[in-house]
C-alpha cells in the first residue's frame, strides 16, 4: 500500500464560505492558501491558516454548546412551579439521549443544516413570548393569555434544546475523529463552554446583553458551519488519510482502499466492538460522572443544618470538571499499559478522599471529585481512541461522545440538586 505521503488528501467538504461575503471570508480565514499542502502532496510546513480555522471552529462549537446548556439552566428561573422543574428534567433527559443515540453522518449533516436556522427561529419565538409577559405588553392581562404564551415559550425552548443537543453531538463526533492535539483542545474548550453555559444564568447579566450574545452566536452558527470548516483543514484531512491509509471523508471510509462494494464501511462498525478490554474503564467513567451530583447532594445535606448552600457553592463543585479537564491535557496521548494501573489507583484514592471531604461538609469535596471524574473520563477517551484506529475510529468517536454526554448531564443534574 502506498504511503500517505504519496497519496492525495481526502476530498474537502464544499466550502460554503465563498458565498458569505469578503469580510466574513477574511474573518473565518478561508481565503489564504494552505501552506501544509503542495498540490495533492503533503509538505512539512505548518499551516497557520488551518490552525486559526481549527481554533475558531472549536470556540464556535463550544459557544453553541454553552448557549444550548444555558437554555436548560434558564428554565428553572422562569418559575419555581413544579411544571418547570419537570421541564428541566425532560430537557436534561433529551440532551442525554441525543449524546447516546448514534445517527449516520449523513443524517447528522442534514439535521445540523436544518436545525441551526430552526434554533434561531425557536430562540426568537421564546424571547418574544417572554418579553410580552415580563414587560406587561399584553393588551388584555387575561391569565389564560399568559398561560398560552408560557406554553409557547416552553415549547420553543424545549425544541431549541433538543436541536442544539443533536447539533452539539455531531460536532463532537467531528472533533473526536480529529488528531490528538485537536481533540484534547476541544475537550478542554468544550468543558469550559459547559461550565459557562450552566453558570451564565446565575450571573447578573442584563437582558439586552444576553439577547445580543445569544443571537450573535446563533447567527454565526447559522452562517458558518464550524464542523465543515474543521474537517476542511489540512490537519484534519491528513489525520484521516494517515488513519485510514487512503483519502476518505467522514462516514465514507472503507476497510479497503479500493472501490470494492464488499469492503467494510466505517459506519457499519458497531460501537460495542470498540470497547473490548476497556469496559471497566468505561463503566468507571460513567459511574463517576453519575456520582458528581450525588457527592454535591451529600455535601449539601451535611451543611444544611448549619450553612445554606448557595448557587456559588454548587458552581464551585461543578468547576472542578474544568480543573480535571485541564490536568488531563498533560496525559500522554499514546497508550501505555504501565501507566494505566497507577493512574486508576491514584484517581480512585483522590475520589475516595473527595467523598470523605464532602461527608464533612467541605466544598472542596465536590470540586475534587468532579475533577477526578473529568480526568478519568478524559483518560478513558484517550485509551479508546488509541485502541481504535483506522476503520474503527468513527465507531470509537460515538463511545467518546457518550462519555462526554454523561459528564455534561451530571453537571446539569446539579441544577436540580441546588433546587432541592
Curated annotation (Swiss-Prot):
Q: Does the keyword Transmembrane helix apply?
A: yes
Transmembrane intervals = 58-78, 81-101, 114-134, 157-177, 181-201, 203-223, 278-298, 312-332, 343-363, 364-384, 399-419
Q: Which domain of life is it from?
A: Viruses
Instruction: Supply one GO CC term from the record.
Output: host cell membrane
Keywords annotated in UniProt: Host membrane, Membrane, Transmembrane, Transmembrane helix
Q: Where in the cell is it found?
A: Host membrane
Q: Is Transmembrane helix one of the keywords?
A: yes
**Topology relative to the membrane, per the entry?**
Multi-pass membrane protein
Q: Which InterPro entries match?
A: Herpes_UL43 (IPR007764)
Family label: Belongs to the alphaherpesvirinae HHV-1 UL43 family.
* Name used for this protein in its record: Membrane protein UL43 homolog
User: Which organism was this protein described from?
Assistant: Gallid herpesvirus 2 (strain Chicken/Md5/ATCC VR-987)
Its gene name is: MDV056
Amino acid at each position: 500500500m502506498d504511503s500517505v505521503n504519496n497519496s492525495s488528501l481526502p476530498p474537502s467538504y464544499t466550502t460554503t464560505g465563498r458565498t458569505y461575503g469578503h469580510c466574513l471570508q477574511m474573518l473565518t480565514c478561508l481565503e489564504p492558501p494552505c501552506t501544509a499542502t503542495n498540490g495533492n502532496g503533503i509538505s512539512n510546513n505548518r499551516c497557520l491558516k488551518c490552525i486559526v480555522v481549527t481554533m475558531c471552529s472549536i470556540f464556535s462549537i463550544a459557544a453553541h454548546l454553552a448557549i444550548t446548556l444555558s437554555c436548560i439552566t434558564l428554565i428553572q428561573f422562569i418559575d419555581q412551579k413544579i411544571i418547570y422543574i419537570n421541564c428541566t428534567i425532560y430537557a436534561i433527559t433529551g440532551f442525554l439521549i441525543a449524546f447516546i443515540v448514534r445517527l449516520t453522518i449523513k443524517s447528522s449533516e442534514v439535521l445540523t443544516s436544518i436545525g441551526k436556522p430552526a434554533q434561531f427561529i425557536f430562540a426568537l419565538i421564546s424571547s418574544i413570548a417572554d418579553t410580552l409577559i415580563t414587560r406587561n405588553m399584553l393588551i388584555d392581562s387575561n391569565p389564560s393569555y399568559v398561560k398560552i404564551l408560557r406554553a409557547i415559550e416552553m415549547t420553543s425552548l424545549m425544541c431549541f434544546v433538543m436541536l442544539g443537543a443533536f447539533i452539539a453531538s455531531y460536532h463532537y463526533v467531528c472533533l473526536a475523529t480529529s488528531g490528538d492535539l485537536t481533540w484534547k483542545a476541544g475537550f478542554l474548550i468544550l468543558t469550559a463552554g459547559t461550565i459557562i453555559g450552566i453558570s451564565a444564568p446565575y450571573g447578573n447579566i442584563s437582558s439586552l446583553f444576553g439577547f445580543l450574545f445569544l443571537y450573535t452566536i446563533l447567527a454565526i452558527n447559522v452562517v458558518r458551519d464550524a464542523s465543515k470548516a474543521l474537517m476542511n483543514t489540512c490537519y484534519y484531512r491528513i489525520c484521516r488519510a494517515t488513519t485510514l491509509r487512503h483519502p476518505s471523508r467522514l462516514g465514507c471510509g472503507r476497510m479497503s482502499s479500493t472501490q470494492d462494494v464488499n469492503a467494510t464501511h466505517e459506519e457499519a462498525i458497531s460501537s460495542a466492538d470498540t470497547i473490548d478490554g476497556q469496559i471497566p474503564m468505561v463503566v468507571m467513567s460513567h459511574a463517576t460522572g453519575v456520582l458528581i451530583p450525588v457527592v454535591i447532594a451529600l455535601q449539601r445535606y451535611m451543611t444544611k443544618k448549619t450553612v445554606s448552600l448557595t448557587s456559588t457553592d454548587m458552581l464551585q463543585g461543578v468547576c472542578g470538571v474544568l480543573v480535571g479537564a485541564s490536568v488531563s491535557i498533560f496525559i500522554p496521548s499514546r497508550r501505555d499499559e504501565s501507566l494505566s494501573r497507577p493512574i486508576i489507583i491514584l484517581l480512585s484514592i483522590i475520589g475516595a478522599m473527595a467523598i470523605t471531604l464532602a461527608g464533612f461538609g467541605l466544598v472542596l469535596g465536590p470540586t475534587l471529585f468532579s475533577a477526578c471524574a473529568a480526568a478519568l473520563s478524559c483518560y478513558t477517551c484517550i485509551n479508546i481512541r488509541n485502541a481504535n484506529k483506522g476503520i474503527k475510529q468513527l465507531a470509537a468517536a460515538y463511545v467518546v461522545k457518550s462519555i462526554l454526554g454523561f459528564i455534561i448531564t451530571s453537571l446539569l443534574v446539579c441544577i436540580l440538586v441546588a433546587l432541592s
